[in-house]
Every structure is written in structure tokens, then in C-alpha cells.
Amino acid sequence: FTSALQLTTNNVRLCGQIVPIGSNLLFETSDTTFGIEICEDLWSTIPPSSSLALQGAEILFNMSADNEGIGKNNYLCSLISQQSARCIAGYVFSSCGFGESTTDVVFAGNGLIYENGSLLARSERFSMKEQLIISEIDVERIRAERRINTTFAANQANLGDKKAVSIATEFVNSKELTLTRKFNAHPFVPQGIELNEHCEEIFSIQVAGLAQRLVHT
């Protein structure tokens, strides 16, 4: 699936209603704003999600028909991680599953949820059963990160005439919300081999700074 380069209309009749169509739609709820792109939009030089994020989308969805190939999954995860980090947003990716595979084209049923570059949840690849993955995306953290990112604000000012269409909508929320995410009580202290890597990096940074000072002393 790819987005149309030029649409002859901004609206389409669907289920007896006239609804907007395009890659520039923002869906606003009382809690957050989200945008949608399709499949290879993510692979483009400037994905539609970039513009949507700059115009207020805090969560980005990608409905995909992404077939499998050797090494492709790692590249896909890298793309989603980078795009969610670059947009300072949550990114939810859902692709075709086993029921749509053939002998020539195979779909692994990739389901991925990222937040600002970090993986929150993923489905089991090549499962022969339907799957549902769930996670919470911290939209308040996303807003805070965007406020302190001067480059993000500068990009917002340079959007030009790329104007999104806002659509008021609402989520059907359950009365009880059970958190699935686990938060480290000591988030700034990594564990295992990562601790050694961070300590070595801190040491190298300090040494480089002191060495430069000694050169000019």
C-alpha cells in the first residue's frame, strides 16, 4: 500500500457518510491526538507521520501489508524506532498475518509498539494464531519532551502550507485500566553489561574534557 500522490477529492462516501480522505488527517480526542500512515509511507524520505507529529499527533499508527525477507525485520524495527524518536511520539505498527500468506509472499503478523525510540511491546512472528498486543504510551512524557526540544519547535514553524485536517473523535475507554508497563525504580542506573558500557563512556567523556583543559593550561 502507498499513499496517492494526488487525490481528486478530499472527501469520500463511506457507510452512508461523507468522510475526509487523505494522508493529512489528525484525529483529536479528549486525551490525545493521533495520525495514520500506510505501509511504505514509513520507508519514504519524509514520511507523512513527520508532518502529522509536527502538527500535534502524539501517537502514530501504521496499517501495513509488509511481506517478509531476509534481514527485513531488523530494518523495519530500526525504522520504527528512529521514526518514533525523531517525531517524539508513540508509534503503533500492525501488519498482515498468517491468514494472508501464500507460497510466494509471506506475512509474519508483525505488531510493534514504540515510544520515543523504545520498544514497548511486540507480537510473536510467524504465529498461526491471532494476536493482540497492548501497552500504554505516556503522552504526558511526549508533550514534555517536545516542549524542551528546540529543534522540534523550529520544525513546527517551518511547516509551510502543509495543513492537516482535524477530526474530532473519541476512544471507547474501559472503566478499569490495568498498567502493563514496568518502570525501573532507578532509571538512571543501568544493569548488567550496559552499566559497564555507560561507566566507560562517562569516564571517556570526563577524560576528553580534562585533556582539552590541560592542553590550554
Model-derived regions, located:
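Enzyme catalytic cores with a strong preference for nitrogen-chemistry domains
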Residues: 1-217
